């Protein structure tokens, strides 16, 4: 008969996996409770960071249709269940790992793909959604201003030519 606590933990893990749009797996061995709490606070409300048994996590991941993470499930594992912006969470975790060598990024999962630790760190170097949209809007605004100048140039040239002709005729008369 299954242990009731494990059954409840399994259901909770599966629910967290199904509610997350991405996850990051870390090894937390050597971190103090205070450091773990600091990481949780830095991650914010869109990310739930919790410790899980590897065997339960494997079962929950399989039930949730998530594959390719088994190789990362060795040693103590803490999982960041990310509901918000994955890039922002990856930045926080990567910076924390740089500052606290005891935190090791094992890998992750995003958009249906298992990620290596290097891929998680590469995602952390990307601009977040808001920054990317701002850059795109700025580029579009600049392009539209240039296009408007190009389209207005012939009309402006024609007006100047007509004004010059009018001035010339007025001077001749």
UniProtKB/Swiss-Prot annotation:
GO terms for biological process: translation. GO terms for cellular component: large ribosomal subunit. The keyword Chaperone does not apply. Pfam families: Ribosomal_L10 (PF00466). SUPFAM superfamilies: Ribosomal protein L10-like. CDD domains: Ribosomal_L10. InterPro entries: Ribosomal_uL10 (IPR001790), Ribosomal_uL10-like_sf (IPR043141), Ribosomal_uL10_bac (IPR022973), Ribosomal_uL10_bac_type (IPR047865), Ribosomal_uL10_CS_bac (IPR002363). Gene3D superfamilies: 3.30.70.1730, 6.10.250.290. The keyword Nuclease does not apply. Keywords: Ribonucleoprotein, Ribosomal protein, RNA-binding, rRNA-binding. GO terms for molecular function: large ribosomal subunit rRNA binding; structural constituent of ribosome. Belongs to the universal ribosomal protein uL10 family. Forms part of the ribosomal stalk, playing a central role in the interaction of the ribosome with GTP-bound translation factors. NCBIfam families: PRK00099.1-1 (NF000955). Part of the ribosomal stalk of the 50S ribosomal subunit. The N-terminus interacts with L11 and the large rRNA to form the base of the stalk. The C-terminus forms an elongated spine to which L12 dimers bind in a sequential fashion forming a multimeric L10(L12)X complex. HAMAP family: Ribosomal_uL10. This is Large ribosomal subunit protein uL10. It comes from Corynebacterium aurimucosum (strain ATCC 700975 / DSM 44827 / CIP 107346 / CN-1).
């Amino acid at each position: 008969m299954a242990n009731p606590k494990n059954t409840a933990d399994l259901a909770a893990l599966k629910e967290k996996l199904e509610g997350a749009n991405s996850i990051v797996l870390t090894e937390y061995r050597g971190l103090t409770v205070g450091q773990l709490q600091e990481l949780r606070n830095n991650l914010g409300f869109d990310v739930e960071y919790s410790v899980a048994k590897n065997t339960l996590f494997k079962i929950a991941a399989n039930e949730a249709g998530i594959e390719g993470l088994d190789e990362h499930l060795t040693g103590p594992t803490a999982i960041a269940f990310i509901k918000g912006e994955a890039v922002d969470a990856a930045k926080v975790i990567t910076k924390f790992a740089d500052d606290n060598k005891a935190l090791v990024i094992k890998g992750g999962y995003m958009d249906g793909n298992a990620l290596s630790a290097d891929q998680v760190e590469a995602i952390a170097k990307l601009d977040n959604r808001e920054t990317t949209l701002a850059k795109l809007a700025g580029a579009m605004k600049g392009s539209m201003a240039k296009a408007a100048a190009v389209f207005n140039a012939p009309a402006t040239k024609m007006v100047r030519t007509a004004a010059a002709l009018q001035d010339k005729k007025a001077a001749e008369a």
